[in-house]
Amino acid sequence: MNPQFIVYACPTGELAKQLETYWQLSREQCGANSAHNYMPHCTLTGFFYDRPDSASYYLQALEEAYKSAQNDLSLEIEIVNLVFNSDWHGLELQAQGVKELVRNFAQIETSPTRTEEIRLKDWLHLSLAYGFAPEKRSHLKQLAQKAIDVQANVGWELRFYQRANTVWECLRTWTL
C-alpha cells in the first residue's frame, strides 16, 4: 500500500513545551482522546497517497513554494483564540501567507503518480482535544487553561510528513 503524505505547520518554542505538557496531563488525567493520535500541529493539506519514490516531487515543490513565499509573503501564524466547544478544544489560527504558500505548492507540484488532488485546508487550527467523553470536557478545559498561554513564545515549522502504516517520518522542515 502506498504511503500517505501531508503538510503540517508545527509549533516550536515555549508553546510547544506547554502543548506537550498538556498532552501528557490530559492523557494521564482524562484518558486518550483523538488528538493524542497526532503530534501538536496545524493541518495545511489533507492526507494524499502516492508511491514512496514520489516524495522528491513534493519536496521540490514545497522548497520552490517556500522560497517564493519568503520573498513575497508574511509567513506569520497568529493564534486568534483558545476555543472550548462541546466536542472540540483547540487554538484557532490565522495565516494567510502560509495558506498562499501551500496553495502555490499544490499548483506547482508535478508527481505523475498521484491520482487525487491535494486538498487544501481553509480552517486553520491546532486541536487540543476531540473525541473525548462528554464528562471530561470541563476537566480538559481546566487543564488547557492552566497549561497553555496563547501569548507564549512560539515559532512554527512547515513540515512534510510521510506516514506508512502507523509510522510517521518527517521528510523535511522549513522555518516559518
For each feature predicted by the language model, list its residue ranges.
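Basic, often amphipathic N-terminal segments
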Residues: M1-E76, A95-E157, V167-L176
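Glycine-rich beta-strand-turn "strand-cap" elements at beta-sheet edges
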Residues: N81-D87, W156-E169
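Short histidine-centered catalytic/ligand-binding loop motif
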Residues: G90-Q94
